[in-house]
């Protein structure tokens, strides 16, 4: 689960099916490999020829003299089983299968599926690609049939060759360049986009990740990877398949929770590429300068929720209120007005609209604006027939779309720093045992869930909230307003309740909404509850429930809170504390706990001097992804925290990092060791192979605890003031025990038998 794929930049590449035949896949790919300055070694494998492209070729993998780290397989699917077995035998860690899958016969697809099925447990990482395949421009690697991409900072994961071609064209126009292109054939590839998202997130050369949504892979794992990546760099999710109104609402909800930018059309994708590539330049207000009347542009801006501001203090004619400075301004005059606007304190961003002219004035203005764009720190959007570069467009509407994308992304980043308020005191938690007693008695089931009265809804309700199971994303709660459809996803938090109340105008019903979402966290874990509808009419709020005892379980896109119930633990001094998972609604208590710690202890825990957690740190600590993170807390009967421990993914594949704090009153009482045991167990369940942390050399108590728990302590390779603690989480193998007493006991038992 926590493995990253082999890097797509090999040192020694084996090309199986390399060819000189015209119009063949092997010929096209070998040409692409040889025309770029690839610094690695290329070895062709061809059954019939001793040389290919002037290079020595081998008849099969068994005859290769040198070890290789990637095999590029260009032969038909009928060869896959034999080739993959040979890769396993030769210890080649990564096999990339490239085909024009759209042109293959059904039997060839079946052969590919069967070969992949047989090799699913092998140690060979298999990636199935469409003809655009893999490109790493900075390394000169192009394993596909498409033109070489310019080097840059955008990592691309596409699911079809046509998407790769479109994204390549958009990249060429926008100009940010590509760090890595991965063209996966989504229906077949065992190595999925989530694997490569993890890789690109850790890649320092990649500053933006643009990924085409893969509906074929596990959605929980996919959006967990996107969420981790979006904490480090911008992520664009391009939705190439048809998404109906409900799925769009779900993807918007995922965007709010994970922090990625969704795009549902090619135009939205192009605008988002510009916006996210210039993500450090954001603004709320947009001024405009134009050499043509632009009043109609405000109509388009209104649809996007943008207000265009005219040039400040420019003495423009009152009849041209939208930045029109005349139809034939000299280029220097246009530039002077634009620079004056950018230097004005009220200007946050400027849109320069340059209409075609009979002479070369428009081209000259565009060049001047391009140079000015490089010199200013404020966003300068350029619309011109001569546009070519980042934040440059051929139509003003495209620039408006990019400006909107910047604002949306800024809002998404701010949402990632929000924390949930504590649960309201009036909430009641349903009992799963009571729910399971009444699957057929719907009125009683509504009572067990603390829902409004079970009753047939009115014909024209004031609002309708619908809970149901999406085939791809699991449990979803929808709210339909006259403007759009909203969705929120479990585990539901008070942040979701507030979002629903605010966006759907349900302030009068906020108590009902809070209880509903709290109850639905329980209902989401009960498969036979397939649907719940809550509506409000003149007679009050009612609920309707649909059940199906035979319903199949659909995994929710977000992992639920740990199923392990809260338990009590007795300290050495006899005090009893409650141990439970940390929830998003614990943010306020978490902050109070950090504030209560002595200054020195806060420093040893966070390795910085702070009085409290920043909003970003607090949100990061409390808004956990329980598919790859975990946290537990210890609290007294009155809710006072005595300790907290957490873990999350590290940069090293298969490794997680931990952190722990205990209040002074609980130190030396066995609590820290117990909390560590809880998160170690959860990390094992999530599939991690190692748990680690860097501990200050001046913190002997933490080093002693780590040693007691089995962590190996070594000096940190990064900082002499730190020690690195690492615990192997892998289950011990069944090896003979080197223990005289144990062995003697086993011999006696054997003799008695």
Please report, for each region that a protein language model flagged, where it lies by residue.
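Catalytic-core regions of core metabolic enzymes
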Residues: 1-544, 551
């Amino acid at each position: 689960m926590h493995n990253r794929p082999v890097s797509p930049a090999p040192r020694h590449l084996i090309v199986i099916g390399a060819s000189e035949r015209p119009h063949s896949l092997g010929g096209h790919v070998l040409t692409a490999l040889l025309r770029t300055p690839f610094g690695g070694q290329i070895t062709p494998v061809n059954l019939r020829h001793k040389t290919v492209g002037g290079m020595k070729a081998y008849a099969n993998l068994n005859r290769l003299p040198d070890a290789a780290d990637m095999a590029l397989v260009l032969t038909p699917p009928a060869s896959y089983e034999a080739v993959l077995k040979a890769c396993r035998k030769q210890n080649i860690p990564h096999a990339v299968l490239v085909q024009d899958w759209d042109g293959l016969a059904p039997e060839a697809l079946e052969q590919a599926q069967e070969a992949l099925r047989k090799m699913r447990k092998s140690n060979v990482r298999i990636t199935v690609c469409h003809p655009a395949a893999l490109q790493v421009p900075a390394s000169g690697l192009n394993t596909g049939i498409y033109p070489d991409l310019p080097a840059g900072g955008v990592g691309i994961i596409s699911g079809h060759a046509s998407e790769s071609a479109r994204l390549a064209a958009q990249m060429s126009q926008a100009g940010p360049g590509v760090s890595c292109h991965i063209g996966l054939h989504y229906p077949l590839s065992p190595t999925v986009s989530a694997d490569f998202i993890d890789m690109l997130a850790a890649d320092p050369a990649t500053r933006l990740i643009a990924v085409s949504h893969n509906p074929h892979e596990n959605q929980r794992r996919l959006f967990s990877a996107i969420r981790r990546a979006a904490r480090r760099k911008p992520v664009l999710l391009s939705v190439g398949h048809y998404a109906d109104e409900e799925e769009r609402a779900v993807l918007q909800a995922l965007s709010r929770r994970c922090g990625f930018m969704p795009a549902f059309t090619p135009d939205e994708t192009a605008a988002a590429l510009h916006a996210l590539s210039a993500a450090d330049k954001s603004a709320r207000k947009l001024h405009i300068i134009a050499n043509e009347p632009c009043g109609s542009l405000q109509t388009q801006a209104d649809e996007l929720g943008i207000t265009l501001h005219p040039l400040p203090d420019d003495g423009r004619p009152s009849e041209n209120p939208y930045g029109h400075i005349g139809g034939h301004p000299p280029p220097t005059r246009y530039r002077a007005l634009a620079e004056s606007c950018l230097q004005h304190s009220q200007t946050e961003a400027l849109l320069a609209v340059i209409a075609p002219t009979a002479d070369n004035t428009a081209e000259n203005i565009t060049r001047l604006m391009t140079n000015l764009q490089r010199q200013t720190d404020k966003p300068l959007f350029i619309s011109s027939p001569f546009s070519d570069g980042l934040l440059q467009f051929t139509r003003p509407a495209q620039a408006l779309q990019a400006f909107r994308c910047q604002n949306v992304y800024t809002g998404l980043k701010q949402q990632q720093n929000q924390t949930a308020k504590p649960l309201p005191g009036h909430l009641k938690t349903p009992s799963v045992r009571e729910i399971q007693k009444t699957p057929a008695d719907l009125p009683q089931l509504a009572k067990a869930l603390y829902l409004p009265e079970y009753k047939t809804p009115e014909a024209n309700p004031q609002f309708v909230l619908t809970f149901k199971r999406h085939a791809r994303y699991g449990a979803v709660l929808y709210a339909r307003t006259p403007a759009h459809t909203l969705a929120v996803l479990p585990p539901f938090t008070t942040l979701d309740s507030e979002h629903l109340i605010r966006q759907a105008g349900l302030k009068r019903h906020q108590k009902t909404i809070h209880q509903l979402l709290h109850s639905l966290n329980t209902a989401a874990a009960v498969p036979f509850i397939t649907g719940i509808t809550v509506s409000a009419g003149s007679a009050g709020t009612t609920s309707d429930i649909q059940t199906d005892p035979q319903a199949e379980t659909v995994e929710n896109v977000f992992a639920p809170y740990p199923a392990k119930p809260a338990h009590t633990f007795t300290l050495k001094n006899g005090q009893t504390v409650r141990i439970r998972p940390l929830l998003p609604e614990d943010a306020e208590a978490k902050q109070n706990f950090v504030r209560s710690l002595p200054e020195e202890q806060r420093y040893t825990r966070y390795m910085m001097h702070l009085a409290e957690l920043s909003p970003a740190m607090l949100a990061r600590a409390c808004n956990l992804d329980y598919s790859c993170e975990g946290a537990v807390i210890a609290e007294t009967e009155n809710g006072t925290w005595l300790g907290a421990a957490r873990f999350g993914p590290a940069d090293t594949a298969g490794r997680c990092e931990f952190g722990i704090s205990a209040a002074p009153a609980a130190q030396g009482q066995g609590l820290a060791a117990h909390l560590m045991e809880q998160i170690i167990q959860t990390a094992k369940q999530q599939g991690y192979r190692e748990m680690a942390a860097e501990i200050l050399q001046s913190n002997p108590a933490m080093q002693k605890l780590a040693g007691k728990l089995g962590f190996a302590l070594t000096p940190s390779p990064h900082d002499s003031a730190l020690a690195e603690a690492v615990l192997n989480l892998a289950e011990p193998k069944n090896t003979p025990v080197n223990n005289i007493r144990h062995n003697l006991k086993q011999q006696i038992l054997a003799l008695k038998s």
